[in-house]
């Protein structure tokens, strides 16, 4: 077995491996999703986790009179259109949370499935983050409320106005995902490939 030692450059630094150098120079684009049957928040962010660029965010609002199957189809279609338009490198979603109602859990799981299918149909890797870890990454405490998350998202991203709650959650998920591009932060944020 032969071992080669990297030579220092003229500046005295060791060169970066080509795969890492490429990763550091290319801006990652992420589609972040806060899935729900009636109000799915989404955000598209790009770039360095310390200074990301917001390419867009909104909430997919589905009226209550629309049957759940049609709502899920609409969510998937909307997300597919976003994927085609923005061409994200990866997708980040909120992990499953504990809820008291079985009906709510099933509904949330169905919306999440619509998002996962939209990403899988386009060959995108999907990563999930627990709400607690997202709050920790953005606010600094895992028990932050929605208003604190929205405030910090606005401040960190330099937004002119506070985004709607579900969109703010998606922006926070996107910020956490960009932070997790650092391997150490990925471990702290408990980044999981879905």
Briefly describe each language-model feature range.
Residues 1-14, 19-194:
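Phosphate- and other anionic-substrate recognition elements at nucleic-acid/protein interfaces
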């Amino acid at each position: 077995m032969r071992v080669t030692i990297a030579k220092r450059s003229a500046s005295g630094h060791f060169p970066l491996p080509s795969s890492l150098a490429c990763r550091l120079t290319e801006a990652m684009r992420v589609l972040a999703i806060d899935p729900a049957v009636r109000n799915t928040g989404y955000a598209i962010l790009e770039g360095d986790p310390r200074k990301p660029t917001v390419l867009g965010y909104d909430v997919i609002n589905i009226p209550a009179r629309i049957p759940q199957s049609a709502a899920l189809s609409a969510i998937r279609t909307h997300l597919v259109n976003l994927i085609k338009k923005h061409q994200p490198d990866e997708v980040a979603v909120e992990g499953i949370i504990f809820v008291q109602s079985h009906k709510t859990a099933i509904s949330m799981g169905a919306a999440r499935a619509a998002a996962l299918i939209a990403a899988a149909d386009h060959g995108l890797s999907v990563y999930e983050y627990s709400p607690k870890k997202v709050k920790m990454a953005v606010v600094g405490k895992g028990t932050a409320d929605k208003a604190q998350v929205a405030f910090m998202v606005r401040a960190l991203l330099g937004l002119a106005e506070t985004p709607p709650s579900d969109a703010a959650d998606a922006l926070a998920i996107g910020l956490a995902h960009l932070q997790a591009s650092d391997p150490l932060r990925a471990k702290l944020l408990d980044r999981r490939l879905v």
